[in-house]
Amino acid sequence: EFLFARTMIGVFKNIEYMCNRTSSKTWGKEAWKKIVVCIVSDRRAKINPRTRAVLAGLGVYQDGIAKQQVNGKDVTAHIYEYTTQVGLELKGTQVSLKPRSATPVQLLFCLKEKNQKKINSHRWFFQAFGRVLDPNICVLIDAGTKPGKDSIYQLWKAFDLEPMCGGACGEIKVMLDHGKKLYNPLIAT
């Protein structure tokens, strides 16, 4: 849940950043309405119970409703949707909920019944949600990766400035505790 929360905190800050771009023709106060955060998780029985609790705290998951079968047919995935105004806070590795500022966040959570690996999760995202949401751009972020406060905006800007751009990537920096240094050159690169 710590890694998931770290990623979500970064995503929330990016949405706030875009909402604060009041002189932008695209973004601004209502920017949150143009952004949907899709979370895809493999295998219902495998998801960390504390991560489930964080998702429930955000309002995008309800424990106890998901079933393996409906009318004798196997269920492939469970989809939850919610627009939250709850935020997350990290104190060490402890995750806690906190009231957010005025910026809501639209969440879509897909909990797959079976473990079908990362590529299948990407397929779910593009084929299922992509068709419905019809996004201009998609940003894929693994749990544990914390985007900088304007990283998602910078990726969007690359696509906006160059409409023929098919893909872009950001820089990933190692997160170290204060006062720590990397002495292993293989890890430092």
Curated annotation (Swiss-Prot):
GO BP annotations listed: cell wall organization; chitin biosynthetic process
Record's keyword annotation contains Transferase: yes
Keywords on record: Cell membrane, Cell wall biogenesis/degradation, Glycosyltransferase, Membrane, Transferase, Transmembrane
This enzyme's EC code(s): 2.4.1.16
Keyword Transferase on entry: yes
One Pfam assignment: Chitin_synth_1
GO molecular function, one term: chitin synthase activity
Compartments where located: Cell membrane
Membrane topology label: Multi-pass membrane protein
GO cellular component annotations of the record: cell septum; plasma membrane
Catalytic activity: [(1->4)-N-acetyl-beta-D-glucosaminyl](n) + UDP-N-acetyl-alpha-D-glucosamine = [(1->4)-N-acetyl-beta-D-glucosaminyl](n+1) + UDP + H(+)
PANTHER family, alphabetized: CHITIN SYNTHASE, CHITIN SYNTHASE 1
Function: Polymerizes chitin, a structural polymer of the cell wall and septum, by transferring the sugar moiety of UDP-GlcNAc to the non-reducing end of the growing chitin polymer.
UniProt similarity note: Belongs to the chitin synthase family. Class I subfamily.
Record's protein name: Chitin synthase 1
Source organism of this protein record: Rhinocladiella atrovirens
UniProt gene name: CHS1
